[in-house]
């Protein structure tokens, strides 16, 4: 029932978009159909990403362990489990793109948009040769990487054995 709210909001602005979205939700819940059918977004999500040079750096406060937590602490709450030796279910079409294209243009956004910290840029020794690392064991299967990657270079596949998060304790 809420599938059209964000596309309507994006197209018509805050007030008209939310009004039309509420009307559409009302029709979907009461009458069983969406007033506007399925409204598509204007463009793909990965096309909306701004270059790092166009954005200011956000300095987030340190987590306190009571109200805010580190990303990997939150991953542990999901009950994520992948067997050792399991093949990686996240693949890159071109392994050079994260470091050669996404890092200079976007400061490699995968390390920020992934809620589980699966992707990271590792800098060793002289700090001159960055390396893109995939920590697939942390993956909570949200598929954000498949949707948001600006180069559409990351492919998410279902892991073998259906392993992954177990959200029963969240």
Model-derived regions, located:
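Iron-sulfur cluster-binding cysteine motifs and their immediate structural context
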Residues: 105-136, 143-168
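Helix-rich C-terminal "cap"/substrate-channel and partner-interaction subdomain
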Residues: 1-98
């Amino acid at each position: 029932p809420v599938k059209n709210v964000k596309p309507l909001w994006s197209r018509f602005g805050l007030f008209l978009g939310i009004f039309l979205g509420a009307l559409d939700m009302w029709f979907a819940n009461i009458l069983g159909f969406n007033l506007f059918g399925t409204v598509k977004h204007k463009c793909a999500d990965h096309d909306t990403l701004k270059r790092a040079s166009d954005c200011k750096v956000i300095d987030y406060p340190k987590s306190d362990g009571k109200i805010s937590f580190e990303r990997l602490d939150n991953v542990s709450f999901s009950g994520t489990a992948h067997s050792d030796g399991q093949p990686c279910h996240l693949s890159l079409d071109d392994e050079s793109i994260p470091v050669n294209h996404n890092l200079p243009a976007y400061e490699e956004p995968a390390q920020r948009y992934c809620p589980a910290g699966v992707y990271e840029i590792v800098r060793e020794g002289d700090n001159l040769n960055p390396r893109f690392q995939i920590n697939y064991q942390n993956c909570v299967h949200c598929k954000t990487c498949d949707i948001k990657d600006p180069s559409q270079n990351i492919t998410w596949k279902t892991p073998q054995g259906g392993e992954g998060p177990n959200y029963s304790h969240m």
